[in-house]
From Swiss-Prot:
One of its GO terms (molecular function) is 3'-5'-RNA exonuclease activity. The gene is rph. It comes from Geobacter metallireducens (strain ATCC 53774 / DSM 7210 / GS-15). Its EC number is 2.7.7.56. This is Ribonuclease PH. It comes from the Bacteria.
Length: 238
């Protein structure tokens, strides 16, 4: 039994609230336990210079954390004058994950800009961001279809993400901050609903991990992500 009462293979309480911000084409509040992220999807009728005239669209992402989303205040990256390496890595991961399930040709020469803003962090902010951003993206693209801008929804399949780690020798799904801080191994899995991987990130903090342990973490992640797909579908059906 974990500190929050969960079993080793259990997700935290997951909630996805759609239409959370009225101005964005797509906007959700996604909650993985005490981790809360606002994800918005904004449509622009233009593409980056490297795509102009090529008849294809683009999906990209930005990620940030509210200064007091963590236990102690962190200054805004804008105030420091540059984006940190962690932020750059996470927003590239979010963008890659969403492009993997978007038909960019069907999207046409327009862009969808995803903004993921962490308002409370308790571990797993990048995985929550990907899971919530997918729902915001679908809502934004549905709106384009309803307006007659697009003939079909340019979504090929769903995408979601979850963390898995080894804490005190045990494989745990969807780590909170305390567990993540104590983890001997930390992995993030991003998968599509056809059971294909977009990205797998894994790091041993102390002892290297075995193939058997990695396989165990993969199995736990796949089971967890399948549950996330069900939660996404339920949210989109409301």
């Amino acid at each position: 039994m974990r500190s929050d009462g969960r079993e080793a293979g259990s997700l935290r309480g997951i909630n996805i609230t759609r239409h959370y911000i009225k101005h964005a084409e797509g906007a959700v509040l996604v909650e993985f336990g005490d981790t809360k992220v606002i994800c918005t999807a904004s449509v622009e009728e233009s593409v980056p210079p490297f795509l102009r005239g090529k008849g294809t669209g683009w999906v990209t992402a930005e990620y940030s954390m509210l200064p007091r989303s963590t236990h102690t205040r962190s200054s805004r990256e804008a105030a420091r004058g540059k984006i940190g390496g962690r932020t750059h890595e996470i927003q590239r991961l979010i963008g890659r994950s969403l492009r993997a399930v978007t038909d960019l040709t069907l999207l046409g020469e327009r862009s969808v800009l995803i903004d993921c803003d962490v308002i409370q962090a308790d571990g797993g902010t990048r995985t929550a961001s990907i899971t919530g951003a997918y729902v915001a993206l679908v809502d934004a693209l549905h709106l384009l279809v309803e307006r007659g801008v697009l003939p079909l929804l340019p979504i090929k399949e769903a995408v979601a993400a979850v963390s898995v780690g080894i804490v005190d020798g045990n494989i745990l799904l969807d780590l909170n901050y305390v567990e993540d801080s104590a983890a001997e191994v930390d992995m993030n899995f991003v998968m599509t609903s056809s059971d294909r991987f977009v990205e797998v990130q894994g790091t041993a903090e102390s002892e290297p991990f075995t193939v058997e342990q990695m396989d165990g973490m993969r199995v736990a992640a796949v089971e967890g992500i399948r549950k996330l797909f069900s939660i996404q579908n339920e949210a989109l059906s409301r």
